[in-house]
């Protein structure tokens, strides 16, 4: 109970900061952009995405007549949040729930949207760039939409399996299923989308410039500092 009070206090304090609301604004933009790519590019071209969205698209392909993808994604997140509740702070869980709600709502709002790019290669690249950058932006600010981020972290803690390995295993299943359900060419375009998305997300998260720190250990720090500053 004491820990819950501490976590609740931390979350309550975050709600009254400009930084948190800026993150939510970027998160909302990212969710809307990514859901537009899902409904406007991925579904029409039969591409799959990585992570939980990809698994959701895989299952939704056979039940799309009965349940909208937005509802399916929300249902898939329920057991994930139950598992993650004991592993993460209340602030992270609440932020992820808000993000999941924004993403689910955006998926519903953008249903039926069509981004008119007939060339599948251009569609995969364009979708990957747009979705990747906006996702990277909100991740950089501490945003989350739940999904495999939570599962990957839990598996890493309990089984010592790197998060990247978990994502790679899921993506392998998604691409293989894409090839089985459609054809190899479509699966390759899915792979291209995933690669471009991953690259763009990384750039959106850490930027194009990389900084390096160098530690100099010396018994004559004044002389070293003088020469470095010259």
PLM regions: where:
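Core subunits and conserved enzymes of cellular information-processing
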Residues: 2-221
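Short amphipathic alpha-helix segments
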Residues: 219-230
């Amino acid at each position: 109970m004491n820990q819950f009070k501490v976590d609740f206090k931390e979350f309550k304090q975050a709600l009254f900061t400009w930084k948190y609301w800026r993150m939510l604004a970027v998160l909302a933009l990212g969710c809307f952009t990514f859901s537009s790519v899902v409904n406007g590019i991925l579904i029409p071209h039969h591409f799959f995405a990585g992570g939980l969205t990809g698994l959701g698209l895989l299952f939704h392909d056979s039940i799309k007549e009965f349940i909208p993808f937005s509802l399916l994604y929300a249902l898939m997140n329920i057991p994930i949040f139950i598992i993650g509740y004991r592993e993460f702070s209340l602030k992270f869980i609440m932020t992820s729930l808000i993000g999941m709600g924004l993403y689910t709502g955006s998926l519903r709002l953008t249903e039926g949207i069509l981004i008119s790019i007939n060339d599948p290669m251009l569609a995969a690249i364009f979708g990957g760039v747009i979705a990747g950058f906006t996702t990277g932006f909100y991740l950089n600010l501490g945003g989350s939409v739940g999904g495999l981020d939570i599962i990957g972290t839990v598996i890493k803690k309990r089984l010592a399996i790197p998060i990247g390995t978990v994502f790679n295993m899921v993506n392998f299943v998604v691409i293989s299923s894409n090839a089985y359900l459609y054809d190899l060419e479509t699966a390759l375009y899915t792979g291209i989308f995933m690669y471009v998305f991953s690259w763009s997300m990384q750039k959106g998260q850490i930027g194009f410039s990389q900084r390096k720190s160098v530690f100099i250990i010396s018994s004559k720090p004044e002389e070293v500092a003088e020469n470095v500053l010259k």
